């Protein structure tokens, strides 16, 4: 039977519940347990698909096409289990499901209430995510509850897991509570009072924490931990310090050395081999001992919040580790780039243009793509980054003046990027949409396969077939592909079903490394293997850096021209 660990947070949000949950899952997985993670989000949105990245961070996409919280990206980077739609749900989904049942008459005329109908539905969703009572059920499901204790929005979720724990019995569930222990510079000490209060709030709704993870900017001394233990009713060995580190991949070792996994296994009566964290130690060593460095300009429109590109940042760092290089990412606001300012990108070893929506900042991205093409700087365009590269090529190489996407200019004379109105989803279901369709859930989503052209750069990276995750509405217009091909653009991958453009590139005798992809490869990158596309991209930037360095040395070594004096 599946055991459950419920992870809650207090005092403030953004403490790192997702990192803590993923790290705990990684340690338990290293003990030989089958683990999954589930994220409960208390907002009323059905999913984060229509939320601003500047407010919510990136939207992480699963293989089965779910638009989910960015924490699911952390989960996939910490453990082997792949996430599904069932691993993330929101208040909006819960209420939508309950109201659908009410309309069908499933409640047989009863008054539908938060307790028991909403709380029961939450429990059913949790069990579904854990595959509870099924042949492929996991050993441990770690359930992260978004928000903080005391928020009105979180109360139904907290009540649901309280009931669930009561029904399952004390040895089948555990509660881990994250709290903030601030350092007050003026007083020169850590303050434990906020943690005492949040533990009390948790008890007031019927939940006693088994473990307190105390977040701070430094390790918390024993004296403060003993004080927290006394006032929170948690044994001293259950008060664990979780301090700031320079890489999240140090967190599993940090928590293991303080005995967190042992505490959880004892509470849940799980008998397992000791944890083996060698792979994490090796990973941290690789992170801390790069042999070289490479600089990447990420030209985006959501650069004010780095979490908007969380998986992309991690994918670049993973590729850096595979190439024994430190990747230094500089965020460039695409709205600041014009033909007069784009030369500022010359200082970087590579240019990357990520995905995005809407017309704001698009011309700056087009400038970046042109600068990379004309100056032979390694370029990787993802989703919108592929589309702007196609638009730029159409305008300045193929001679299609004012070429554009109908997303940005519905009246463009050359819509080289346009809205596709019918396609098959990841599960084969035929979907339709038009310009006035709802924004939520109307994109091409999830994993889909494409055939890769032989003798292409893409083929050297992926082989014959590429399967990647998608999240977009607009596609390269098939009516312009022949024109673009004749002008020198290589269409190196097409979807197997609709033959839509998936990868474009420039021949390597024209440009050393120029690739645009319609999908989102960053969602499948892992710290162990990186991702073949990002690995190749960073390798190309390193080659470019080395070639420029050698050319500069050769230029410096030239003998001085002697001018005869008169």
Swiss-Prot record:
Residues reported in the UniProt entry to bind UTP: 13, 191-196, 227
Ranges for the region named Amidoligase domain are 1-270
Key words of the record: ATP-binding, Glutamine amidotransferase, Ligase, Magnesium, Metal-binding, Nucleotide-binding, Pyrimidine biosynthesis
Report TM segments: none
Q: Which SUPFAM superfamilies match?
A: Class I glutamine amidotransferase-like (SSF52317), P-loop containing nucleoside triphosphate hydrolases (SSF52540)
Q: Where is the active site?
A: 383 (nucleophile), 520, 522
The residues that hold CTP are: 13, 151-153, 191-196, 227
Q: Which GO terms describe its molecular function?
A: ATP binding; CTP synthase activity; glutaminase activity; identical protein binding; metal ion binding
**Superkingdom of origin:** Bacteria
Pathway the protein takes part in: Pyrimidine metabolism; CTP biosynthesis via de novo pathway; CTP from UDP: step 2/2
How does its record describe regulation of its activity? Allosterically activated by GTP, when glutamine is the substrate; GTP has no effect on the reaction when ammonia is the substrate. The allosteric effector GTP functions by stabilizing the protein conformation that binds the tetrahedral intermediate(s) formed during glutamine hydrolysis. Inhibited by the product CTP, via allosteric rather than competitive inhibition.
- Sites where the protein binds Mg(2+): 71, 144
What EC number is given for this enzyme?
6.3.4.2
Q: Where does ATP bind?
A: 14-19, 71
Q: Which reaction does it catalyse?
A: UTP + L-glutamine + ATP + H2O = CTP + L-glutamate + ADP + phosphate + 2 H(+); L-glutamine + H2O = L-glutamate + NH4(+); UTP + NH4(+) + ATP = CTP + ADP + phosphate + 2 H(+)
What does this protein do, in the record's words? Catalyzes the ATP-dependent amination of UTP to CTP with either L-glutamine or ammonia as the source of nitrogen. Regulates intracellular CTP levels through interactions with the four ribonucleotide triphosphates.
Can you tell me which family this protein belongs to?
Answer: Belongs to the CTP synthase family.
- The protein in question is named CTP synthase
* Species of the source: Polaromonas naphthalenivorans (strain CJ2)
Name the encoding gene, please. Answer: pyrG
């Amino acid at each position: 039977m599946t055991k459950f660990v419920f992870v809650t947070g207090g005092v403030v949000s953004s403490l790192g519940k997702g990192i803590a949950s993923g790290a705990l899952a990684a340690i338990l997985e290293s003990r030989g347990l089958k683990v999954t993670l589930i994220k409960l989000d208390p907002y009323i949105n059905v999913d984060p698909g229509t939320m601003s990245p500047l407010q919510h961070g990136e939207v992480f996409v699963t293989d089965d096409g779910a638009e989910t919280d960015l924490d699911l990206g952390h989960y996939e980077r910490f453990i082997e289990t792949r996430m599904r739609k069932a691993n993330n749900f929101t208040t909006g989904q819960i209420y939508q499901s309950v109201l659908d049942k009410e309309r069908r008459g499933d409640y047989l005329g009863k008054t539908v209430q938060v307790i028991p109908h909403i709380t029961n539905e939450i429990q059913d969703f949790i069990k579904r995510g854990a595959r509870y009572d099924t042949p492929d059920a996991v050993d441990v499901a770690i359930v992260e509850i978004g928000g903080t204790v005391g928020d009105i929005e979180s109360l139904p979720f907290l009540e649901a897991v309280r009931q669930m724990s009561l029904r399952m019995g004390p040895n089948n569930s555990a509660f881990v509570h994250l709290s903030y222990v601030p350092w007050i510079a003026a007083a020169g000490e850590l303050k434990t009072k906020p943690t005492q209060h949040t533990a009390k709030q948790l008890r007031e709704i019927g939940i006693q924490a088994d473990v307190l993870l105390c977040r701070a900017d430094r390790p918390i001394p024993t004296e403060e931990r003993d004080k927290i233990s006394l006032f929170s009713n948690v044994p001293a060995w259950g008060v664990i310090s979780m301090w700031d580190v320079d890489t999240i991949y140090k967190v599993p070792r940090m928590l293991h050395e303080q005995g967190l996994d042992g505490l959880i296994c004892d509470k849940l009566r799980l008998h397992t081999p000791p944890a083996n964290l060698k792979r994490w130690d090796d990973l941290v060593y690789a992170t801390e001992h790069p042999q070289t460095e490479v600089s990447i300009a990420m030209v985006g429109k959501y650069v004010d919040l780095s979490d908007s590109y969380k998986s992309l940042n991690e994918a670049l760092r993973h590729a850096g580790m595979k190439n024994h290089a430190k990747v230094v990412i500089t965020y460039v606001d695409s709205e600041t780039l014009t033909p007069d300012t784009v030369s500022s990108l010359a200082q970087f070893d590579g240019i990357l243009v990520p995905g995005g929506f809407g017309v704001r900042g698009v011309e700056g991205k087009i400038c970046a793509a042109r600068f990379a093409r004309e100056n032979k700087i390694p370029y990787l365009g993802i989703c919108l980054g592929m589309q702007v590269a196609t638009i730029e090529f159409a305008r300045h190489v193929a001679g299609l003046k004012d070429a554009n996407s109908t997303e940005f200019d519905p009246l463009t004379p050359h819509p080289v990027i346009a809205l596709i109105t019918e396609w098959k989803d990841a599960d084969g279901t035929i979907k339709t949409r038009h310009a006035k369709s709802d924004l939520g859930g109307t994109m091409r989503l999830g994993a889909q396969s494409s055939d890769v052209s032989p003798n292409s750069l893409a083929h050297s990276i992926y082989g014959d077939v590429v399967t990647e995750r998608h999240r977009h509405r607009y596609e390269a217009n098939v009516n312009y592909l022949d024109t673009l091909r004749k002008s020198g653009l290589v269409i190196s991958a097409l979807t197997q079903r609709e033959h839509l453009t998936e990868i474009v590139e420039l021949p390597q005798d024209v440009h050393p490394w120029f690739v645009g992809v319609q999908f989102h490869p960053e969602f499948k990158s892992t710290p162990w293997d990186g991702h073949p596309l990002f690995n190749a991209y960073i390798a190309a930037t390193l080659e470019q850096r080395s070639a420029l360095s050698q050319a500069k040395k050769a230029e410096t070594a030239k003998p001085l021209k002697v001018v005869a004096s008169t």
